[in-house]
Amino acid sequence: MMYRIRVVLTVLVFPLLCFGQLTDKQSFEVDSVLSKMTLQQKVGQLFMVAAYSNQGIEHQREVESLARTYHIGGVIMMQGGPKRQLHFLQRLHNASSLPLLVGQDAEWGQAMRLDSTYKFPTSLTVGAANDIVLTKDLGKALAFECKRVGVHISFSPVLDVNTNPTNPIIGARSFGSTVQGVSAHGIAQIQGLQGNDVLACGKHFPGHGDTQQDSHKTLPKVDRSLAELKQMEWVPFKAAVDHGVGSIMIAHLNIPSLEPSGKPTSLSKKVITEVLKNQWNFKGLIITDALNMKGVSEYASPGKLEVEAFKAGNDILLFPMNVPAASKGLMTSFTSGELSIEELDRRVKKILIAKSITRSYEDWNLSKKFSLETTLTSLNQGRRSLNEEVSFKIIAAAATALPNGTAAMPIKELDRKFIHISLGDLTDNSIFKAYLDRYKEMSHFTGSDTPLEAARASDVIIVSFHQNTKNPWKRYKLNASEFKLISELSSMGKSMYVVHFANPYGILTYPSLKGNQQVISMYENNHVAQLLAPQFLFGARAMKGILPVELGTWGKAGDSRLIQSIQRLKYGRPFEVGLSEAPLDRIDSTMSHAIKVGATPGGQILVARRGNVVYQKSFGTHTYGGKDVGWKDLYDLASITKITATLPGIMHWYEKQPLLLKTTLGNHTNRLAGSDKENLVIEDVLAHQSGLAAWIPFYLKTIKTDSIKDYWYTDLDVEGFVRIRPEMSIRTEVRDTMFSMLAKSELSGSDYRYSDLGYYLFQEMLEERFNEPLDQWVTNTIYAPLGAQRLTYTPLKNGFLLDEIVPSEEDSYWRNSTVHGTVHDMGAAMLGGVAGHAGLFANSNDLGKMMQMYLNRG
């Protein structure tokens, strides 16, 4: 693994929009603007002020005033919403005499700061995915999201190597705990951002990964020697500089090996000028971390603090607490000669260059003439589906089976009893439960008060730990009752699977698991992670993610347990199988129209391609105005029974006796002795070219007269009768009558004619062969191993509730009632609901499993 990443570092040399690489026209314009600026304007360019689009008009006017009066160079957009941000930026651009450089913390997209925006996976998830191409694609998607809301510089990626599991502020914001991983993914994300006209910012130099404290609240101390810093913390930053990163953010840290005085690194000339500028020859922007943070704000007052930051070598002073005081302090220092105006010109020129190579000038000009919201939205349309694609791919690639697992993976045997227990933040784990049930329906329990008897009575225990991953630096951990429950479950000796939907450092708080166990880290707790996790458990997808961090006895960084797919049906997205979403969207409108005009009250539709369900929806109601259709609800499959119950039996037999298809029905069942049907060749019957009639309305013989009806039917459930519907039973001897009628029916040559009748005969043949009723054989041999629990004959007898079954018909010719819960086909109903040609019920999900089994060739 380490070798592979080292190779990646040597070959990742893509064209970058290098900082300072200008056309002659751009260079002339920058010099021209700089030559006309007053000292006040130049000083103002150093400030990047906080702007909140969720605050009121007074705040907006205050920031506008700073733009007009102090000529601030930019703003860092904080909390708010995308539309409000664009409206605010339009006002600020109009208030500013020069273009503004707009920055935002957008490590996982604008969702880090803005409501109703797309949240991408965290950097730690990206590190686990271990796919440099995906990381670059993520950078590209992040760039488009930035441009959509008027942002020119994204304060990302985090280049800190998170070697301290208890780090209170970095955590999942880092790509991991190895210099190779952080370097490779950092470079790739920088390329994705800057290759799409958004300036990247590597942070938090000289390295915030090995801290016990949060620099927002205090000045953290890093006890690393210079040699250790060079071997660990500095490696990703140096790699980023060598690959053209546009800016570096300086952290507020106390690192005695660099600055024995205890001065914050953000104010240290030794760190910024001597290392970054002189030793590394970094030409890009150098930006302080926010100056309102306790790690630096208590060191000096506004006015003095900004002077110290400039002396250290910073170009942009981020989030100054008091712009008037800061401006006054800097102006005084420049006019007195304490600070060099020539140096100021060099730094302001770098800021102007940054504006020139991003969309700063374009957005400033647009704001004067057009709606910034309308223009930027139209320029960046169609991105949401691509955002979802790259996020889906990353989360799918990241899922990690911890290397110390011993339980069988994937879970193959489904004819066992399963239980699922949810722990942690249980706000919404419905998707995980629903997709577990798509593979194997099971009992679901919530919380640490789960009855242990239920777990003891099961064969397989699945535990899921969920946490809100809104703040990825948090290290979620088990509480005492959850710890106790997992310990007790582990001691039962069952096959146990723990799926961790949270920051993986929380796994360090788990008890040691005994016996057959496997922990899976999903890193995220969103709908995609919950959709994918069951697929990894049950082998629909291969699992190849790596641990991006050290987890003690649970595994080392770079380790994993690679799990192969066993080709079970997957649930995914159209892009995975080369489909466009547009044709699938038309299914919605077609079904809506069908329901609207009364063609059907509802239905289920499932579309799968290459073993991947890319569309699965339920529509409408069971009856007109009735219960909503759910994905679990059963429909009468009618003639699909032929290929879903009877055909598997013939195929199973054929595997043992390949010449079966050339033999006759009479070779395998005595039902046809003496009739011309005993000479029918099996392959001709299968091909519907045996001459059999299409069907026989057997039921008509039983209702010709009232006396005949009285003979055949009773409303009682008594011995010698089989139920057709509640309060309607028919004599079991009708079976002999039906086969007698079939045996006497006429044959009509070898032309193709679709026929039910051969499948009545196949049922007889198979039941004699297997010495077992067809419904029992196909359930035990085919459906149960497939996990197709909702493929069933006689659903009411097999434990399904009536409201899980969609009615078939209003029968006014024989049963004179709503056909609900029993088979619609008259012949199958007369046989008690089990027949070779009809009788099966299923939902679209389990029918899909059966069809995929055929496509997989078994």
Language model features with spans:
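Short, conserved catalytic-motif segment at the N-terminal edge
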Residues: 577-637, 658-663, 667, 825
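Second-shell residues forming the walls of enzyme active-site clefts
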Residues: 38, 59, 75, 83-100, ...
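Preference for extracellular/luminal or secreted protein segments
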Residues: 21-66, 278, 300-580
